[in-house]
Swiss-Prot record:
Binds 2 magnesium or manganese ions per subunit. The keyword Manganese applies. ATP binds at residues 161-216. One of its GO terms (molecular function) is ATP binding. InterPro entries: ATP-grasp (IPR011761), ATP_grasp_subdomain_1 (IPR013815), D-Ala_lig_Van_CS (IPR000291), D_ala_D_ala (IPR005905), Dala_Dala_lig_C (IPR011095), Dala_Dala_lig_N (IPR011127), PreATP-grasp_dom_sf (IPR016185). Cell wall formation. This is D-alanine--D-alanine ligase. GO terms for biological process: cell wall organization; peptidoglycan biosynthetic process; regulation of cell shape. It is found in: Cytoplasm. The lineage of its organism: Bacteria, Bacillati, Bacillota, Bacilli, Lactobacillales. Belongs to the D-alanine--D-alanine ligase family. It comes from Streptococcus pneumoniae (strain ATCC 700669 / Spain 23F-1). GO terms for cellular component: cytosol. Mg(2+) 1 binds at D287, E300.
Amino acid sequence: MKQTIILLYGGRSAEREVSVLSAESVMRAVNYDRFTVKTFFISQSGDSIKTQEFSHAPGQEDRLMTNETIDWDKKVAPSAIYEEGAVVFPVLHGPMGEDGSVQGFLEVLKMPYVGCNILSSSLAMDKITTKRVLESAGIAQVPYVAIVEGDDVTAKIAEVEEKLAYPVFTKPSNMGSSVGISKSENQEELRQALKLAFRYDSRVLVEQGVNAREIEVGLLGNYDVKSTLPGEVVKDVAFYDYDAKYIDNKVTMDIPAKISDDVVAVMRQNAETAFRAIGGLGLSRCDFFYTDKGEIFLNELNTMPGFTQWSMYPLLWENMGISYPELIERLVDLAKESFDKREAHLI
């Protein structure tokens, strides 16, 4: 009998369009000899919509429901996703997706799910908190200043100019896929960048800009996490923003990255250390800066990296000999393993 994968996609965050792309890639890559796929769309307003079911590979003409094609007659209660024995694959990016909220809901439903748990998801989603945890783990990061809504912005800008040097990058603390990120070359640009970032979150991070290559490492596993050889994001734009990643395709990927064995070893070790420091489970992608001075800075941990056909994470594992369909199978098995352990602890 086939096992059911319940694919959750869409969501309320600014990254909902990325989620649809990831979900369509996953539904086409699943091993349908082993799995049946049932899909549920979470609308921009937060409603749950029961969408397609697939017992065999979908055709090229098959497309998942989006906010533009919603069939409101198929609206269901969020708990309608429950199916005994099914594993949930929450292909949700950003807030209300990979920040622990959906993970908590799935734990209340007593359902296994792919990826990190409540704590590690919420921790990694918040850039400021992640930085503080990684500092305690002894992992190098670029200098930064944290700004919280209600702070004296003028005083904080003065702190930025005292501790950092232009250019700086301003980021919402609780967002991903480069949404709301700006590069600032002077104080006026910084003020505008802060206004943009505060549209997406009440906590904002200002980081020192560095002249660096962007190198990424894939992580797979629970308590025995394994890492990939690094890959490099090769950019044709000023910085790797949302449009460059998902709309304009102005990036290419060099897998494996052309870096020395010593640098590879440090990045893989730091990635695995960071994953353990946050209590990661299932998967993550760890992003590094490798500066022209030879410095290695950990930039962020992404607990639900993109799964589009051009995304770095599946390509990194493909380079390690694990195909896209096999990667999905391993993630499902890891989800069941972590679920069994979580349930065993409830005694």
